[in-house]
């Protein structure tokens, strides 16, 4: 298990647009495994490559329907509907929580570790997580979606 350091707000990779993944090889498989291990250790719902200083279009989410970790490589939201308000935090912005407005349902098209395309439609917190992690790939932090900060989460 190789844990990666999660970088925090102010780190350069968090404000950059990531490059597409073009090589689906053992190095990518290792990166995905490291990100999954790091996500488990951090006890989060998702992790994007720029959060570990890697400028690739790759995110890991925990799918609320299956409870499995899913790699979203070169992801693109193809449809969204409705609106939901949720409380969000971010592993790269520790200790900060805010109410955000996100789509209620999203459909994302992405590649898996083998380069095969797939599509998934999710709602609830998984939809929020998909939007949150894909924002990271474009240099956007969740603060840009906060409508109200929460002082005490307990």
Task: Identify what each model region corresponds to.
Residues 1-154:
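Positively charged
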């Amino acid at each position: 298990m190789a844990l990666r350091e999660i970088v925090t707000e102010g780190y350069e990779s968090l404000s950059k647009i990531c490059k597409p993944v073009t090589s689906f090889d053992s190095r990518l498989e290792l990166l995905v495994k490291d990100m999954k291990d790091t996500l488990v250790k951090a006890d989060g719902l998702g992790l994007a490559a720029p959060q570990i200083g890697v400028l690739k279009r790759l995110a890991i989410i925990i799918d609320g329907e299956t409870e499995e970790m899913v790699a979203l490589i070169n992801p693109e939201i193809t449809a969204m509907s409705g609106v939901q308000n949720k409380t969000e935090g971010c592993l790269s912005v520790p200790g900060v929580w805010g109410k955000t407005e996100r789509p209620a349902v999203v459909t994302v098209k992405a590649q898996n570790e083998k380069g095969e395309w797939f599509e998934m439609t999710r709602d609830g917190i998984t939809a929020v997580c998909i939007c949150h992690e894909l924002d990271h790939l474009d240099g956007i932090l969740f603060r840009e979606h906060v409508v109200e900060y929460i002082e005490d989460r307990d």
